[in-house]
C-alpha cells in the first residue's frame, strides 16, 4: 500500500516560475580493452588493449565508486546534467544535478563564479547523484591507489555543460504551481546501512511543478539510495538507478514492451 502526503504551496501564480533543462555529460571513450581475467581492473601485463588514437598510451575513463583500475569499456546510457531554476518574483535559485560520484568544493565554487551575475541567481546548488558507474571526478579512483583518475579536459567540459544547462533552464522559465509529496516506501525496499550508526531515511520526497492548465513541467525527487545497482564488476558507463528513476517518471515504465 502506498500512502502519499501532499501539500500545495500558496504562491501567486503570476510571480512563481520554474524552468527545467537537461543535457548529456557522458565522457568520450577512446581506447578499447579486454578484461582477460574478468576482475574488472585494467592490468597492462595481463589485459589486452587497442591504441585507437595511436598515441602510445592507454587513454582510459576511470570509473569511480569501487576499486581502482576500473576502466570503462562501453556506454550503456547517457549521464545527464539536469537543471531547474525556481523564481518566486523575489528570489531566484538554480539547482544542477549531475550523474557523477561527487564534486569537490573548489570545482563547485568555480561553477558559481563563472555564472554571469546578469542571470539574477541568488543561489546555485550543484548536486551529484553519487553515481558509482561514471567517471572519477574526485581523484580517488585512478589507475592505482595513489593516482587520480580525473581527466582535466572532461572537468572543463563538465563545468561548461553545467552552466549551459543552467542557462537553458532560465530560458525555459514559465508560470508554475507547486505541490509537495512525502511517500513512505514499502518496508521491503532494499535499503541497508552496514555502518554504525544505522541511519535510514526510507521516505521519497517529491516536488511537482504544473502549469496553470494542470500539465506537468517537471519534478524534483529525493530518495536516499546508493546509485550503485550495477555494482563493481560493471564496466559500462551508466546513470544507474538515478537514470531509471528519471526516465520512469518522465516517460513511464515499460515491461515486456508494455507501459505499466
Where on the chain are the PLM-derived regions?
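Bacterial N-terminal signal peptides
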Residues: 1-6
Amino acid at each position: 500500500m502506498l500512502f502519499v502526503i501532499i501539500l500545495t504551496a500558496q504562491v501567486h501564480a503570476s510571480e512563481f516560475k520554474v524552468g527545467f533543462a537537461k543535457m548529456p555529460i557522458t565522457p568520450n571513450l577512446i581506447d578499447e580493452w579486454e578484461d582477460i581475467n574478468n576482475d574488472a581492473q585494467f592490468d597492462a601485463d595481463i589485459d589486452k588493449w587497442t591504441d585507437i588514437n595511436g598515441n602510445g598510451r592507454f587513454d582510459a575513463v576511470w570509473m569511480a565508486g569501487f576499486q581502482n583500475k576500473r576502466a570503462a569499456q562501453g556506454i550503456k546510457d547517457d549521464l545527464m546534467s539536469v537543471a531547474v531554476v525556481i523564481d518566486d518574483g523575489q528570489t531566484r535559485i538554480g539547482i544542477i544535478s549531475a550523474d557523477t560520484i561527487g564534486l569537490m568544493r573548489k570545482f563547485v565554487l568555480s561553477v558559481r563564479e563563472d555564472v554571469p551575475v546578469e542571470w539574477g541567481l541568488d543561489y546555485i546548488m550543484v548536486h551529484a547523484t553519487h553515481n558509482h558507474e561514471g567517471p572519477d571526478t574526485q581523484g580517488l579512483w585512478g589507475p592505482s591507489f595513489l593516482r587520480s583518475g580525473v581527466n582535466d579536459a572532461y572537468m572543463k567540459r563538465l563545468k561548461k555543460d553545467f552552466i549551459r544547462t543552467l542557462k537553458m533552464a532560465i530560458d525555459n522559465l514559465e508560470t508554475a504551481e507547486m505541490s509537495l509529496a512525502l511517500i513512505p516506501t514499502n518496508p521491503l525496499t532494499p535499503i541497508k546501512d552496514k555502518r554504525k550508526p544505522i541511519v535510514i531515511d526510507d521516505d521519497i520526497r517529491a516536488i511537482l511543478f504544473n502549469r496553470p492548465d494542470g500539465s506537468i513541467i517537471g519534478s524534483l525527487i529525493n530518495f536516499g539510495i546508493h546509485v550503485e545497482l550495477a555494482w563493481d564488476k560493471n564496466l559500462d558507463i551508466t546513470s544507474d538507478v538515478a537514470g531509471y528513476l528519471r526516465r520512469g517518471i518522465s516517460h513511464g515504465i515499460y515491461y515486456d514492451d508494455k507501459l505499466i
